[in-house]
């Protein structure tokens, strides 16, 4: 049912895109296309309330119904294991869709276009490449989890089984801090855009956005978030395809590829980009873009490797689908920021959209470009797309925090003999508590003047030091608890020292520590890089001094299921060691090769050559973006339906049998 409704949603959004063709000329005639964006003046405030409350309620009802139908017709039993692991039987397509959705934050849609507006074509590329390789490489850890801890509910259970309570508590702090940072970014971006387009009170928006998410997550747990991920991702891809079609193939205002090229060349002549070759927007030779790329690359390792949401997707996936799901998800996700920002971020530049520095930092480039180009239709589409991203990624964070508190706090320290019913009750209580607290956190950050852009760049400073210790704990037999714990803690303080020290040393800020000096690219760069390198060095060198006698089989003995289930037994039957080793080797080769291409082989020759795109190369660049997002849409929309065909037909047969029984018809 949910997948059929998702297809209808795709059709509806596509029809809205077609209707946009006629709206562009009328918007132009009305003066909508004039390069000006007025905060809060694009849409009526009632539209904001409809999206935040009305659309949230619709998705909460639809997704809850889908979960109830699965329970009724597929015999799904709602236990604490099922609630937090989705039965460990999710297939490749839905795993990939869930990864794409969980990794599509407000920042994916907003910050990627911000750096396009600031640095030109290099911004979208470095955002996409610098944030997709983590997912590609995480596939290695995901399959190692399947091999070494098939019964795990969280990655922290593995740390405790190997290193004990002290290390477990340290990494629990890092994990919860990661969830808070990601949640804050989601709501900062979402509330800012709702306020910027409709004038709805930003604090009220921040409080209301999580409510619908909270409802369907309460009903269906992790499986509900997977269903929501799929449906929301369809809408996001449909909106992006509509923008691409409008800018490059339909709109007379942008003039297609040739028109965009001419406008971007003219924009660079009027306002050259400092640090870019020839001041051009159409070049990868951008110092600012490269610095952002490094910060982005380092910072995002923390928000994947230290975020329970991604470990939870690895836990929920079938062992045979884990690596394929992460590799496919990573490559499909690349298309979202790369194509959207290459399209809408550069459209804002081409049309001369004027934004204040504060509006840029709030991430309002995409809504401004869509509003100026397409009027109210564009604004509504951006608002809908952003709401989909915030709520789907938000649901992933909700269930992640729920699992951490349930299994790593309550079951570990409060009630080791807890029953499944007790754990389920705790899980739901945490969802309500964290769901209500999410908005409060965003309001606090807004009140002290922190924007989406600032929090996005600072996250690696705060959590990057835990990345390598966690990765080595899962993959390296010689890692010891003292080195891993010290690496995470000392790395954090070293990162903070480098961050603050650089901010003080920058002469343009007069030696004052402020949001402006801390938000400078060089302050962020040194803080992010210091954290991950110091944490990794202490863990690596500290572990070399002592040979470990640890056996991986000890982990699986220490981590047990709360309840046995048919889903769990299916997962165990899929747990063939030879198959998992082949998957591990494939993840090393596939993830490693794609990382080298995206970080070195593709961008660096273009950077060092100083090449400025001509119209032909720009057309090729746009063509790659269009083909990539179209292919990604095909896989993310189509593959889950293909893989779910047997379940769909089973539901249809049982519904038909029930209907025939009710009407007294003989089979």
Each predicted region: which residue ranges?
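Membrane-embedded helix-loop-helix hairpins and adjacent transmembrane boundary segments
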Residues: 2-667
